[in-house]
Amino acid sequence: MKFSLLALALATAAFASPMDIDARALSEGNELRNGDCKDITFIFARASTEPGLLILTHPNDRMSKPGKVACQGVGPKYTADLPSNALPGNTSPAAIAEAQGLFEQAAKKCPDTQILAGGYSQGTAVMDGSIKKLSSDVQAKIKGVALFGYTRNAQERGQIQGFDKDKTKIYCAVGDMVCQGTLVITAAHFTYVADAGAATRWLVSKLD
């Protein structure tokens, strides 16, 4: 599975110096499953049809936390296919179950890790559906969730139902109609990389 451009911008801006995150590991985004426990676990669900893009932010934008972050993308059961957007949860039950399993794996495998999470477009529905299903103990380990182009924004009334609103940051661009409960894609839906810096600062601020 691969991380999106937005996930890479977040992960590298928030947590890494140029040599801290191996290029292959970032591209595959499988460090929770295959790697050692880290102080922070970052779980991200990409947008529909989104391929992995190995893009790093400028070094001056980084807030370095060398070697302290495990980056994990949701997949392969989450296929990021277009038809799943039209399902009742705006993504597939398999995708939700997979993301739920990743949160639970992080909490069980790495009991001392602090979990941060994010999603873009259909990936926001994956985050919404999975986090709602978590036990209160696992939810408590999630320090912050950033959602970009939240496809469940209208349905969930600007939150993840049953999850602490103070731990949720929603980015909905002006003119992005998916945030209004439709599946109409406009140019505004592709502008969220510009919010990566602000989202990074917010996520880092939620850590203990």
Swiss-Prot record:
Main location: secreted
Site features described as Transition state stabilizer, chain residue numbers: S48, Q122
Record localization: Secreted
InterPro entries, sorted: AB_hydrolase_fold, Cutinase/axe, CUTINASE_2, Cutinase_monf
Gene Ontology biological process terms from the UniProt entry: antibiotic biosynthetic process; carbohydrate catabolic process; monocarboxylic acid biosynthetic process
Processing and modification events after translation: The 2 disulfide bonds play a critical role in holding the catalytic residues in juxta-position; reduction of the disulfide bridges results in the complete inactivation of the enzyme.
Signal sequence range: 1-16
Keywords from the UniProt entry: Disulfide bond, Hydrolase, Secreted, Serine esterase, Signal
Molecular-function GO term, any one: cutinase activity
GO cellular component, one term: extracellular region
Reaction catalysis annotation: cutin + H2O = cutin monomers
Domain of life: Eukaryota
Catalytic residues (positions): S121, D176, H189
EC numbers: 3.1.1.74
Disulfide bonds: C37-C110, C172-C179
Function: Catalyzes the hydrolysis of complex carboxylic polyesters found in the cell wall of plants. Degrades cutin, a macromolecule that forms the structure of the plant cuticle.
Family according to the record: Belongs to the cutinase family.
Name of the featured protein: Probable cutinase 1
Organism in which the protein naturally occurs: Penicillium rubens (strain ATCC 28089 / DSM 1075 / NRRL 1951 / Wisconsin 54-1255) (Penicillium chrysogenum)
